[in-house]
Amino acid sequence: SLDAESLIAAARRKTGLQDFGDESFRTGLEVLTRSLDREAHLHPVGRMIMRQRLTGLLCVRLKAQQLFARHPEIRQQPIEAPLVIAGLQRTGTTMLHRLLASDPRMRAMRSYEAMNPISEQHPAGSVDPRLKATRLAEKALRYMAPEFFAIHPVDADAPEEEILLLDYAFLSDVAESLADVPSYAAWLAQQDVTPAYEYMKSLLQLMQWQQSQPQGQPQRWVLKTPAHLGHLDILLKVFPDARIIQTHRDPARTAASYSSMIAHGHGVFTDQVDACAVAAHWHRKNVGMVEAAMRVRAQHPQAFIDVSYYDVIKDPLAQVQLIYQFAGIALTPAALAAMKATRAENPQNKHGVHSYSLEDFGL
């Protein structure tokens, strides 16, 4: 069943580990599992996938805690002046993230790292087992929801949103993007999500610590998650020197596109998708996020740069130049060449054209 205690017991059995460290995450897990159980109308396959997903999150927490206890130096790793892309969904954040991440001096979390931030021992020259597992999950999603890929590219080895790291604290809106969980959503809206951002930072430190750095400067993190818009005050508390790139696009265009993506995501877990209810819920959330972002911007104007989706589409490298000037980074020939190669490999609509209209969602 989707019961918090049974999931915790399963994770302990699977890993052979007992210690979660700080267990304040339990409240969020309990509220979430109750909501999924009673409100989400999960079909049997959806319930099975959700159980595996939540157990996987708990397994990572157990393994991470073991490393934090053995290696306190992990939490001393510096995460300096990260670039943070925070704009509403469908505003060019993925394209911009992949472009910036292609600079060899930048460090972005890959999809397979988001699924499991902890590197396991494997023979030199062999494929990381995390990459294999994530490719398998990608294949399953392609089978269950082929249209999803035209909306949002999924690639095991490509940069991924760290919203998935916030999810390890059970204080993120990932659940709302996968299922109808109104009581969890209402509870989450009232929470201080600082513990999720602090845990996210510790996982970034863990990934950085695991990766043997070449001599010289450590890479600079480039992060990207639309949900940061609602919590920029907390993000700046945890990463005080963050440089925030806020992306913009006509909301009438993004609302339908994003509603379509969420509705397809829900369809993996349930046969009962109310597209209009999905759209109304996320429209309310997005309005709240933008209003919260504007309040934070008024207090920290120097931390932000604005980037238009239309300018990114027209001349992405010109926008990168402006971002780098803002962040005090030199745009080197090597970085420029890497970005041009990334652009050529990922043309718009590579995975198909995504068709939708506002009317489909009662907007």
Listing of model-derived features with the role each one plays in the protein:
Residues 235-260, 323:
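Conserved phosphate-donor/acceptor-positioning beta-strand/loop module used by diverse small-molecule
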